[in-house]
């Protein structure tokens, strides 16, 4: 039996479909209602919450493999407590539940946000991106946003489990791209292109196809004895303008053409912060999202490609696939509502 958390999320929904296609029995956790995903009727759904330690221990009965994909992604200041509870405490509960049942293998979906960073002054002075891989160390003295900190602390919980005998492997994907809800996760970038906005922020973004994340996660967890290691997953880095431009072209829409200068982005996030404090509404842009991509970073994936003998899909191919899928979904919804 394979147990999956985060089945309603981008990685979880594709992972469950892949596990079912392989003929594996799947048990998955849900909170409020069973997510409407492909193969949902072939899954044993268990109502619960990763913050419920006792409930998780019961859910792992007869389980041989656990895929922990659940997590909260947010840069809003009001979500700091939730990030701690879901990402850190939730992962600690998963680890403890696995340790209660010796022999379980855990595949944990972390993030490149948990890698830490290095200064890379020479590279930056030469106009080159700073390169990071699995050996990157977390700088305890540096300023980190709440999301990155939560993923780092969550990963520490997995390393704790490993030190106590847990067989676990960790993947650190960059921004995962795939066709999902228009209003969730990275798909909002594609929605931005579809809506024909005029402005874009200069900078780069590291991307990886959700299909590659799922395939590599499954192979590392199910098909290898590897334990106590982490693997960076990223197809490459592209300018945000190019990503939005390609998506707009796939949708047959006009791409954004006006770059937002840094000073304007700095002003906007401050105004949004004040508005959020006064109204309680979530900010449309935060300090972290305003500054994302300014510092050029590139993630090296030599380790996973050598280990699995597998390369990543090109970003352009992923964008084209996502846009085609999203257009098909949109047309289907239009037909159903007409």
Where are these regions (language model features)?
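N-terminal Rossmann NAD(P)H-binding glycine-rich loop of SDR-like oxidoreductase domains
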Residues: 1-22
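N-terminal Rossmann-fold cofactor-binding loop
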Residues: 29-34, 50
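NAD(P)H-binding glycine-rich loop region in Rossmannoid oxidoreductase-like domains
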Residues: 43-89, 97
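Conserved Rossmann-fold NAD(P)-dependent oxidoreductase catalytic core, especially the SDR/UDP-sugar
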Residues: 89-146
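Substrate-positioning beta->alpha
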Residues: 93, 153, 184-185, 201-222, ...
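Active-site Tyr-X1-5-Lys
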Residues: 142-169
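NAD(P)-dependent short-chain dehydrogenase/reductase
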Residues: 162-207
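Mid/C-terminal beta-alpha module of Rossmann-like enzyme folds, strongest
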Residues: 216-284, 301, 306, 311-338
